[in-house]
């Protein structure tokens, strides 16, 4: 058996958009019920893609502003980024373009990115829709996600739910493909 190829996947986005749930649900096949803000955490998943053994390192990051100086330390040697926002949090969607995309481009301009709309299960939730309506907002549409992905030159836009696992595996499969099957460049992250 050949040695495993190591892929470092870093998940970024605003606090409370579901980054940790995304990773735990994928890595452990269970949805964590309690919200615990992340400072930094990582997980490893061993899998195969075709005839290749993969060691997928999943790096969780803190989205809160107070970690802006610390967070980029986790970007070193990243192979792919998942830039996440909550489908039912328009501010987190706007922050992809104003905060997260510029941050990735500053530190790791050559590393592929996938834009991920999280909490897909809440898009049609009556309680969530009522709260959004009270503030004059609506859930982010698939079309809006695709448009933003084009603007930030992400490889793809995907939507998923960590709670129901809808499209969850596909997000990570796409991330792995982006590293293995797109012309592989040496990770060029500049972290000082």
UniProtKB/Swiss-Prot annotation:
GTP binds at residues 13-20, 60-64, 118-121. Residues 190-192 form a propeptide. It is found in: Cell membrane. One of its GO terms (cellular component) is cytoplasmic vesicle. A lipid is attached at residue 189 (S-geranylgeranyl cysteine). Keywords: Cell membrane, GTP-binding, Lipoprotein, Membrane, Methylation, Nucleotide-binding, Prenylation. SMART domains: RAB, RAS, RHO. A motif (Effector region) lies at residues 35-43. It is a lipid-anchor. GO terms for biological process: actin filament organization; cell migration; chemotaxis; cortical cytoskeleton organization; establishment of protein localization; establishment or maintenance of cell polarity; G protein-coupled chemorepellent receptor signaling pathway; mitotic cytokinesis. The modification Cysteine methyl ester is found at residue 189. Pfam families: Ras (PF00071). GO terms for molecular function: GTP binding; GTPase activity; protein domain specific binding; protein kinase binding. Belongs to the small GTPase superfamily. Rho family. PANTHER family: RHO FAMILY GTPASE. Interacts with pakB. This is Rho-related protein racC. It comes from Dictyostelium discoideum.
């Amino acid at each position: 058996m050949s040695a495993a190829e190591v892929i470092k996947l870093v998940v970024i986005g605003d606090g409370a958009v579901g980054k940790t749930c995304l990773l735990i649900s994928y890595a452990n096949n269970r949805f964590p019920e309690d919200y615990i803000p992340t400072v930094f955490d990582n997980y490893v998943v061993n899998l195969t893609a075709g005839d290749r053994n993969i060691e997928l390192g999943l790096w969780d990051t803190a989205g809160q502003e107070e970690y802006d100086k610390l967070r980029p330390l986790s970007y070193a040697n990243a192979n792919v980024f998942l830039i996440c926002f909550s489908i039912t949090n328009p501010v987190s969607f706007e922050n992809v373009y104003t905060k997260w995309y510029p941050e990735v481009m500053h530190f790791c301009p050559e590393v592929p990115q996938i834009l991920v709309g999280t909490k897909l299960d809440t898009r049609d939730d009556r309680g969530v829709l009522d709260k959004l309506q009270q503030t004059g907002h609506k859930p982010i549409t698939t079309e809006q996600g695709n448009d933003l992905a084009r603007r930030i030159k992400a490889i793809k836009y995907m939507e998923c739910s960590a709670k129901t696992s809808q499209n969850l595996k596909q997000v990570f499969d796409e991330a792995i493909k982006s590293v293995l099957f797109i012309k592989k460049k040496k990770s060029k992250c500049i972290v000082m």
